[in-house]
Amino acid sequence: IRDSCYPMWYNGHGIDIGRLHRGYWLPVKPGWYYGCGEYGAEGLDSAEVMEERYPREWLREPFDPGRIVRSQTKSFSGFFYDAQEDMQGWISRSQRYQAFATRMMTEAFRRDDRMVSNAIHLFIDAWPSGWMKSIMDCKRIPKQAYFAYRDALAPLLVSLRTDRFAYTAGETIQIEAFLCNDTAKSGAYTLAFELYNEQNKLIQTGRVPAHADACRAAYIASAEFPAETAQDRETLTLRAVLLDGNGDVVNDTEQKLTVFQDVTVVPNDDVVILKLEPGLHTVAGETVTVKPCGMLPLHFVSRKTAHPAVAEFKEQDFSYWYNAKEDCITPLLDTTFTVEGFTPILLSNNMDEQGNWGPVLAAAEKLYEGKHYVICQLELRQENPVAKRFLRNLYRLGTK
């Protein structure tokens, strides 16, 4: 069975990325093997290609990727990352996202023992602004995704997998390790784990035996360690190194995680937090229009609003949240809204009445008759430390 699958560009296409990352695939008969005929995400051409080959009109200031013929970055980037300020910012951010999506999907396919074939679309572009999901442009300049793809296709690959990219201090972190062997040789190896703190200091190690069966992918072990930090938030890096019988490195990889100190959420009667159903509503004297996300529920919202409730957060904090009930990553937003008179807190992307994609609201607030009215369409699952901190910050809006 062959099929295309673009959940990290045509959001949710084929299968939600949380389920793909967890190990699921499209419906297939029991015992059948399968392949993925196409997948990928868009990354803009290099500045060199743009400046040499693009019409000047496409590049005039202020730079707008929507002027690039056949590019979908302007329309769809709001599903995945913040809007950028200039040409170099758009190139860098789009290519960085493309690399992230390429690694996430390719490694999911490598871990799937029944996935026998897959093809990124495309490897090399034929034209300027041709097919920007290509991982190398028409001048043979590799995008960041080229290197992510190369690394994910190592014949003998160590792949780390987690459904949680953020933890609260005191929890136990569990990261699964898989050994993906595309060679015809079996062998015995050792898998070494190394945990580093934000200052790149080695703080914990561990080793387990790892056997690679020929032409197979298999779970090996989970690295378990306490989520500890003396800071308010800290990025930890787990490195996994595959060693042969001589102690030489065969393959290695790493996964970054963020550990947050716990916070206390104190409800405030002066703050009214609402999550609205699709339709028309009147809130704080304003008409609110709520509609479903136009390209399936989303895994990202932008905090690029300068609102004090999101000042402490980083770009990707509001993305790929864990769902304890489902035990996997699930979307955090299934509806957006538009309203006048409210101050934006979180932004998303949706289609307007003319069929154009553009910015809309995921959360916004208004002070009205002595109370702060907050419309928040996110699923604020409290097992996610960012969701808990955000809820705390919303209630603090009413603190005099």
Residue spans for each PLM region:
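Short amphipathic C-terminal alpha-helix that caps PH/PH-like domains
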Residues: 389-398
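Solvent-exposed loop/turn segments at secondary-structure junctions
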Residues: 41-43, 125-126, 278-281, 379-382
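Conserved small/polar residues in nucleotide/adenosyl-binding loops
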Residues: 1
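Beta-strand-rich binding/interaction modules
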Residues: 170-211, 218-224, 232-245
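Structured N-terminal alpha/beta-domain signature
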Residues: 258, 262-291, 374-376, 394
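Substrate-binding clefts and catalytic carboxylate motifs of secreted carbohydrate-active enzymes
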Residues: 14-192, 203, 343, 348
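Short beta-strand elements
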Residues: 210-212, 247-265
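Catalytic beta-strand/loop cores that center a nucleophilic Ser/Cys/Thr
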Residues: 288-386
